[in-house]
Structure formats: structure tokens, C-alpha cells
Amino acid sequence: MSVQATLRGRRRAAGTLLAAGALALAACTPAGEGDGDTSGEPDASGAAGTTQLSIATGGTGGVYYPLGGGFATVIGEQVDGYSATVSETNASVDNMQLIGDGGADLALVLGDTAADAVNGEADFEGAPVTACALGRLYDNYTQIVTSADSGITSIEDMEGASVSLGSPGSGTEIIALRILEAAGIDPDSGISRQQLGVAETVEALRDGTIDAGFWSGGLPTGALVDYATTGEMVLIPHGEYATVMQEAYGAYYTETEIPADTYEGQDEAISVVVVPNVLVANPDNMDEGLQEQITAAIFDSREQLTEVHPAAADLDPATAGEVEYMDICPGSQAYFDGQ
């Protein structure tokens, strides 16, 4: 069955940096509470004399949430008249829907999900989303996790197992379904399909209620850092499927490696599929001047943001405008042109 039909050295510093990131977060709001229109005058939604922006992120156990909190901090510090808060969501699919319906002003999103959204494909079939990219951020590594005693050493070994494919409405779920398709496993009949976020996946692995789980995130991911300390975590290599996924869906899927020692007890590099992350906005709801100011605040603050999460070390204005699958926001392009 096709996925279209089915869907319709950093580890060591990670623990303290993720804790610091949590402390750096701006106040968190429920998904969908942004007004989605930042083209007008400041209003009373933020501090006195400021307009409050909503940033759609992901679950608290991943990278989007703390990094989005860092973005909120630098926006509040560097963009006059604006503050920002983060919203916990199921991540990429939810986030693009929030951008489309005005429920969020900014969102962190996987590149493949963003492409589906602007092209009206997969979960967005018949309902394309108007969006532009403020820039490419960092790569998401597909991390397929199991326990040492599961007997699973490859994707093929998952046949008949209980496997989490990520939260419903997440970019992880899209990637998981496409990897299984590339491996010839039907996600509806070939596995016992579960839908859990990364923190819940780790809990279920510890409890023995699932055999394996998919997660797409930056390196290192906090929930996996914690799980690796038990000595039970095993990462499953799968980078060989990147070529098939490129041919079927697009060039944003590539093969790379999770470096050895990214997680405790991980002695060897692991071949995986990666996909870039982008920060997106709705150009109908955000003027070019604000786009440029936000882009500058984020990409000029790489060192500060790296203290929130190590993935921010990959923020690079020299390559951030290289987004082939959707338009760059014109204000962001102006910033990149000036570098």
C-alpha cells in the first residue's frame, strides 16, 4: 500500500544544555492560540506595547520545543515591538496546518512535510498551504530505536513487531511510513502500528509494550540521551533506503551517519536517512520587514542558540537559503543577500 494512501562530541553536553534550554523557554501556549496576523499594529496580546508571536514546535522530548524557545528569546530581545511564545504540538503536519489556518505565526517543520503542504499532497491533498521558508535550519536524523534484547537489527526484522511510527500528525510518521514502504513492509498489516511521541516511545520501550520506535530529530535528542544511559538502547541502520525515497518523493531525503558516541554506548556510526528542517511563515500574514528581522535575529544568534540546543550549531546563513522545495520568504532572502 502506498504511503499517500496510508497517510492521506554533542552527547556529553546535551543533558545540561537541554536543561538550560528548558529554562530559557518563553511562556508556553496551547497550539492554535496565536492570532496568525503579524502585519498590523502592535496589540495587547504580548507585553505592554508589543505584539506576541506564536511559534509552533513539537513535543517536549524533542528538539523543536527547546530550540523554538530559544527562537522566542532572541525574537523578544532583538525584534522591536514583538515578543514570542512557543506552542507544544505534534510537530510538522500539525504545524503546517497551524500556519495555513492562522493558528501560528512561525513553525518548525520538516522539509518533506513542508513540500507536501505547499504542493497540496499527502495529508494536505486538495488543501495546499500558503507558506514560505525563513530558512533551512539543521538536518533531522531518522533515529530508529529498539532495545538490546528485542532481536531487531534491521528494518526487515520489524515484520510482525509492535512499532511506534511517531505521533499522529508528525513529520516522523511521514518518514516512518516511507521507510517502511521502501523496505517492502505494509504499515497496516506488516507491523502492529503504534503512534507515540519520542518521550512516550522511550517509556514504552522501557516497559516492553513496543519493540521499536521511529523518531526524526536533531542530534542529540534529549529523550534518547536519557534512554541511552540505561545501556539498553540500540539504533537501527537504514540509510540504504534514501535512494528509493529520493526517487519516489524528492531529493530532500539523503543518507548520512549518526556519528559514533553521539549517544552513550553507541560505539559505531549508524547509517540513517536525514531530511532538513525549515522555519516557515505565511507570507500573507507576515510582512517582509518582520520576516527579515526575525531571520536576522535567529541566524545572527547561532552561538546563543547553541547554548539552548547543540543542533543550532548547524544554523548557517550561507546555506540557509538553499530550499528547493518551497519559496524563501522575500524578507529572509533580503537578509541572506546581505551576508
Task: Give the ranges of each region predicted by the language model.
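Pocket-flanking alpha-helical
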Residues: 69-74, 85-127, 144, 199-204, ...
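C-terminal motif of bacterial Sec signal peptides marking the signal peptidase cleavage site
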Residues: 24-27
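Bacterial signal peptide processing site
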Residues: 29-32
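An extracytoplasmic/periplasmic, membrane-proximal ligand-sensing/linker region
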Residues: 200, 207, 217-235, 240, ...
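Pocket-lining segment of extracytoplasmic ligand-binding domains
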Residues: 111-113, 119-124, 150, 187-285
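Bacterial N-terminal signal peptides that target proteins for export
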Residues: 2-18
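Ligand-binding clefts/hinges and TM-proximal coupling segments of bilobed small-molecule sensing domains
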Residues: 161-178, 252-324
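Bilobed "Venus flytrap"/periplasmic-binding protein-like clamshell domains
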Residues: 52-78, 82-86, 139-207, 322, ...
